[in-house]
Amino acid sequence: ESTAHYGDNLVRYLVAEFYQVCVLNPIKTCQMRKNNIRKTKTDKVDTYVIAKTLMMQDDLRFISFYDLDMMDLKALGRFRQKTIKQRTRLKIQLTTYVDQVFPEIQYFFKSGLHQNAVYALLKEAPSPKEIASMHMTHLANLLKVNSHGHFTKEQAKELRVLAQKSVGANDSAISIQITQTIQQIELLDSQLEKIEAEM
């Protein structure tokens, strides 16, 4: 009788030992229990009900190694969706934080905030004040390397001017939240890669 994840280990063990395993839907055994004269629920009664249900089924389907693989795939799929939702929430939080400290930056990066170049920049300099004080060569190189050559030195100059004129709040608490949120997003990115590779 299916007991959700509680019986998975037993099913896997029995299949690995080449036993024929059939997992019954609890709805079927529940109906059989209702028809049972003795209403007391004990292990012996449960065993009897399950055995009787098995005997009365014409379409028994036994668990195979393929079924176990599919169970693993479904579990990974559910975990992947959960991880994506976590990452999405973090990205929304990050956008909120950046809007408070450097609202102009979203108009500078046309592809949006969620790209390697922006993450690399904000991890090192999470406020416009810090970006404005960065050495131009370092800023230009940081953007170029993390965008695979997409950003030029001229664009780095434009960004620094934008940072100097920003109306954003210079808030160290939000800056910490920005850097740590990016680290969490990157961790989830790494985890998703491993999950998808396993799938």
Describe each model-derived feature in a short phrase.
Residues 1-199:
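A detector of single, family-specific signature residues
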